[in-house]
Amino acid sequence: MTVNLTLQHASEIIGQDNVDLTLAAGASAKVSNLTVASEWLTNNTGYLVTISVNDKSGNVLSSKRAGLSVEDDWTVFPRYGIVAGSPTDQNSILVKNLEAYRKELELMKSMNINSYFFYDAYNEATDPFPEGVDSFVQKWNTWSHTQVDTKAVKELVDQVHKSGAVAMLYNMISADSNPKNPALPLAALAYNFYDSFGKKGEPMTYTIGDNPTQVYYDPANPDWQKYIAGVMKSAMDRMGFDGWQGDTIGDNRVTDYEHRNSTDEADSHMMSDSYASFINAMKDLIGEKYYITINDVNGGNDDKLAKARQDVVYNELWTNGGSVIPGRMQVAYGDLKARIDMVRNKTGKSLIVGAYMEEPGIDYTVPGGKATNGAGKDALAGKPLQADATLLVDATVAAAGGYHMSIAALANANAALNVLQSAYYPTQYLSVAKDTIRKLYNYQQFITAYENLLRGEGVTNSTQAVSTKNASGEILSKDALGVTGDQVWTFAKSGKGFSTVQMINMMGINAGWHNEEGYADNKTPDAQENLTVRLSLAGKTAQEAAKIADQVYVTSPDDWATSSMKKAQASLETDENGQPVLVISVPKLTLWNMLYIKEDTTATPVEPVTNQAGKKVDNTVTSEASSETAKSENTTVNKGSEAPTDTKPSVEAPKLDETTKPAPSVDELVNSAAVPVAIAVSETAHDKKDDNSVSNTDQGTVASDSITTPASEAASTAASTVSSEVSESVTVSSEPSETENSSEASTSESATPTTTAISESHAVVEPVASLTESESQASTSLVSETTSTIVSVAPSEVSESTSEEVILMDYQKTSIVGIDSL
């Protein structure tokens, strides 16, 4: 029996390690020293880690796969999550719910979330955390009178830091929660030029019902800038936050106090005109140490914000916003991509998208509640969130080069994890099924592992023609913009030395992303098989095209592939102009596929590294993609009038070279198209922006620890054997697995992850067994907890000899219990 570890970047195997075992019936063994050496790793790079267990004939007994990101700057590939009040306790953040929050944060950590913003965790906009106050009730919050325990907030911020992530404090950039008694004189307020947020000439005010909730200052007002900078710096210093997630109520044409009654537009300006100067003023007043971003509601102010020193770009997108595509609103998947493309072109950054799914409408003035849309009916009927609706938005945003912020920790008694369905984050009516969480987990692994292909430096839309046909020759890619449904939306991107083709399945469904009608508007597309993708290679020579045809791969986060990158069958044809066309066979499409085409025909393949002498192998994936599910998937792996659409809606309170010998495939190397393995790392202090650290976010399951190590240090240190400070252990047992008869990946509530720890000399992959309560709460110092992964084998399935290596008769009845989770 052998335990194998493989580290892969795109199609290249970077490094491997394995340990051989001899196991007797009914016995268990602990295996150490599966190592990911720091010299294998490059900063701001995503990797796929696969761990598999094989019998002595090479058959896969069980396996897991996860994305690993090595990064010294989370803003390059932001993966944003939410912490907000609990719907179980009047939207409050309470000490008594800390354990529930911790469990959710551990799960989100395993989903590679590297940044969190704490929503509505403040007392009031102009005094977020009063000094000397342990708990406060939000007086402005008239619908639930939310309570916030500052100890709870501090402990959650600490937990975020221990995971190697950053914590952002949410607050409006120009709001005052006391409309009748604002903190600054009336001269500092913004005044409506048109009837919009109140009457013309009156202070810009947000009202819920008949209750004025917030009044707004002009972000350009220097007195306001100095005041709020001092307030926010004090709050972030005392509570340990790393930055400010600034929010806006939407754009509006305003005047200053002196010109509040003027009808001359020259005396007015848009609130968004001052976003950039406000951000830059905050950077100067608060300091570069703190991160800052502003929610540009519905986008469109990219030109204004181009000179802003904001660290990431965040847009909350609504269907009432104007699309980048002329003459449209932002209602379709393609409109989301268009906005992401615009931000990328203007700023060079990957857009964080806030796009809330379904938004169940329920009128609670009616006894028992009355649904006002299909999603509301679903919620009242107790139905969960429609999984594919969420996954399709995740796929669209990621394939376009952005990140969909959707996962939230709410300490919700009705959900192990939450997916945002409303702009008021504690109000999430639809539960999230375990299988949906499992799929979300797999998508997060994919987005992390292939981040350089999806949104790396230089990745842009390709000008090469691309299309998709079915087995009958019917063209399924009917609309390159992605605004029409009932198609396989296909678009190409290019990067340095490669291209990708993104395939989003909309067969049998419409292109609307919001899905407010819930299950009445089915979002599960018709699965496709045996597709053909044609990609123009115009400009390539015949020789170059032939080389490229041998460097085509397919992968998907969906269950048929679970991030496994497989060699695809590809051939060449010529178009009417005699230019080469790459013809690629795609065996299956569920929701989202990505084709990876290596176009660098001169590069020498990376020579893989093995941690065990004599086990060096070729590093290029060469096996053809198969429509069959891999063996391992059969195992259990335990504005004002001028811009009315830029305002937030009212809301409740991705031919062989004959001179080259065919190389073994990844499937041959790890003998599996595995499902995810968790990555976590041991704990170190978090030093905010000055840290310049590698963040190896763990990628696997419900609980783990993390570490940050300076990127320069991690990249330069040599591989070595495992020291006493970081150890890895795999326990192999011949006891039967409790889930041995399961035929597909399943959610295990008790399992804990495999971890990777990067020390000064190396990184260690550490499969972790399910911990007892006391073990799971054990503190860590320099290293991760010493735990183990259990590989279970029923005694009846092993050979009678207790001195020989176990021979497994039924591979579906063996599981890696310790790293089972999702």
Swiss-Prot record:
Sequence segments annotated as region (Disordered): 607-669, 683-788
Region forming the signal peptide: 1-38
Chemical reaction(s) catalysed: Endohydrolysis of (1->6)-alpha-D-glucosidic linkages in dextran
EC number: 3.2.1.11
Entry keyword annotation includes Hydrolase: yes
EC class (word): hydrolase
Gene Ontology molecular functions: dextranase activity
Protein name, as recorded: Dextranase
